[in-house]
């Protein structure tokens, strides 16, 4: 693929983002990724935003349908229809996740030439295995949970050694890894400990905040604090869903 073709695909992705056509955006950035050339920071972010929206729509649908399916007052036929529809959404969600994981393993992680990119892509790998874990059951769930944790842990080790505590990618990783502990592993103590450590480490080094990433970093710090507040007050198990965000 020529440089011109690649630039056109990136431009298409930007147009698709502006018009909120995230499936088109994802396909354009998938084609860019498949050229095998390392992505620039801008291209990396376009890819991430595209697939986050594509998979996010399915995750949201899945939660709504699952909730309807579990309502005991529904008739057997309605429950069956809800189950079938949930399974259809699940299939779409799985296909998207494995598409992203394929791009990560085949192109993105092997080509990552600096710690920032490596952490970004390993975090992404952890995220997409986590999304699979949200809908998986049995042995399949155990496998994707292990894969998610391994990717997050690899990213976490690199970020601690190579990135400032205020770096938005390091903070975003801590945010999502803590959500993984809370939601997927059902380990609120570990989730709180990880989130608090990341928040405290960033506060201690606020003077290292890069002007360019100030907004991103402080937003993720706020999300970490929001989650800590929610998780520490959630002793009654009122079913509030922990917030997740801050993917850059």
Swiss-Prot record:
Q: Where in the cell is it found?
A: Cytoplasm
Q: Where are the transmembrane segments?
A: none
Q: Identify the main location.
A: cytoplasm
Q: What keywords does the record list, in alphabetical order? A: Cytoplasm
InterPro entries, sorted: 14-3-3, 14-3-3_CS, 14-3-3_dom_sf, 14-3-3_domain
Per the record's keyword annotation, is Magnesium included, yes or no? no
Instruction: Write down the Pfam families for this protein, in alphabetical order.
Output: 14-3-3
In which domain of life is the source organism classified? Answer: Eukaryota
Gene Ontology cellular component annotations, sorted alphabetically: cytoplasm
Q: Which family does it belong to?
A: Belongs to the 14-3-3 family.
Cited function: Adapter protein implicated in the regulation of a large spectrum of both general and specialized signaling pathways. Binds to a large number of partners, usually by recognition of a phosphoserine or phosphothreonine motif. Binding generally results in the modulation of the activity of the binding partner.
Its assembly, as annotated, is: Homodimer.
Protein name (Swiss-Prot/TrEMBL): 14-3-3 protein zeta
Q: What is the lineage of its organism?
A: Eukaryota, Metazoa, Ecdysozoa, Arthropoda, Hexapoda
Primary gene name: 14-3-3zeta
């Amino acid at each position: 693929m020529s440089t011109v073709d690649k630039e056109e695909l990136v431009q298409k992705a930007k147009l698709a983002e502006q018009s909120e056509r995230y499936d088109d955006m994802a396909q354009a950035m998938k084609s860019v990724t498949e050229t095998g050339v390392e992505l620039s920071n801008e291209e990396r972010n376009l890819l991430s935003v595209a697939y986050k929206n594509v998979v996010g729509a399915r995750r949201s649908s899945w939660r709504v349908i699952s909730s309807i399916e579990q309502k005991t007052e529904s008739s057997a036929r309605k429950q069956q229809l809800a189950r079938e529809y949930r399974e259809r959404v699940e299939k779409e969600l799985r296909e998207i996740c494995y598409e992203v994981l394929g791009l990560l393993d085949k192109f993105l992680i092997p080509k990552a030439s600096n710690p920032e990119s490596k952490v970004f892509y390993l975090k992404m790998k952890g995220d997409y295995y986590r999304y699979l874990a949200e809908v998986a059951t049995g042995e399949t769930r155990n496998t994707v949970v292990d894969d998610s944790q391994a990717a997050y842990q690899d990213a976490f080790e690199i970020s601690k050694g190579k990135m400032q505590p205020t770096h938005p990618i390091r903070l975003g990783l801590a945010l999502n890894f803590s959500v993984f502990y809370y939601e997927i592993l059902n380990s609120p103590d570990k989730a709180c400990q990880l989130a608090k450590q990341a928040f405290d480490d960033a506060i201690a080094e606020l003077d290292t905040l890069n002007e360019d990433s100030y907004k991103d970093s402080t937003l993720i710090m706020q999300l970490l604090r929001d989650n800590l507040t929610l998780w520490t007050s959630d002793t009654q198990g009122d079913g509030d869903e922990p917030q997740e965000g801050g993917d850059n």
